């Protein structure tokens, strides 16, 4: 059994190791600790410092590392684990990984729809911040004697952010306070005490017109409108296009998110505006939307992002080219083969290899990995 190649995945803490051997049982297993009943090579990999789990299915392994572990140290050890009996790839000697501008997951802790804490999680950090005391007080007012607080509290996914985690926290706090102003808290408490919250579903949607949005001079109100906007249609594009010119980054970012929900090639020009935004967070979000839509027509625009100053944006561009690219993108990929960010360089190498070998992109594999049972 040999390692054919090692590929990055959308998760910075997971690498895909493609093997020359395909499982005949068509089963999958997740391994988290060394056990005698497991395959020897699995135990060898689990013995490597920094590896936390291995998912084995078909002809590949999804290897997870600890957030603070370094792929530059782990990858040669993975290859060495196969070297006793197998031919392996030569160890790569990549530059130091820059973790200062990475992907950050933002979540909001709520009880009966009343927010009271923010949590940010990056590859190597977790940061929490409680909302002002009045939010905690109103959350307490919404409790009844029969409430199971632990069961009824809920983490709301606010999506991904990008940048320095302390600066991101400041921005997310500003967004949350704009979306849930103090003046709205008594209404939320009243609703919490009157309604049956067994479903724990508290998101309210309200459609606004272009005229109503345009007449609003408070950016917090505009953001609140977008955050409570239902799934948009083509008729909403003028409003969202206007929001792309907003002075506040959270408004522009949310406009991009909503545009991405209109699953049509016709919205690509508006997403391209996001790719040129002065905020890296907006550029990356636009790249994510384009990647989710998967239209090859966006390749020329995504190729331009290989020159973006932020690695998290360049990585998204390289990943999209890996998924959708063809021989036309090879010159641009080869021109950027020496990118100074490890993840970007590796993704560019894989895109070149896939295109030159004529291999198909395995988008369905990412879904299988994301949905695997841990």
Swiss-Prot record:
Q: Which residues form the signal peptide?
A: none
Keyword terms, alphabetized:
Virulence
Q: Which Gene3D superfamilies match?
A: Leucine-rich Repeat Variant (1.25.10.10), Scaffold protein Nfu/NifU, N-terminal domain (3.30.1370.70)
Among InterPro entries, the record links this protein to: ARM-like (IPR011989), ARM-type_fold (IPR016024), Nfu/NifU_N (IPR014824), Nfu/NifU_N_sf (IPR036498), PBS_lyase_HEAT (IPR004155), Virulence_F_dom (IPR025989)
A single GO molecular function term of this UniProt record: oxidoreductase activity
Summarizing the function annotation, the protein's role is: Required for hemolysin production.
Q: What family is this protein classified in?
A: Belongs to the CvfC family.
Q: Identify this protein by name.
A: Conserved virulence factor C
Which organism was this protein described from?
Staphylococcus aureus (strain MSSA476)
Q: What is the lineage of its organism?
A: Bacteria, Bacillati, Bacillota, Bacilli, Bacillales
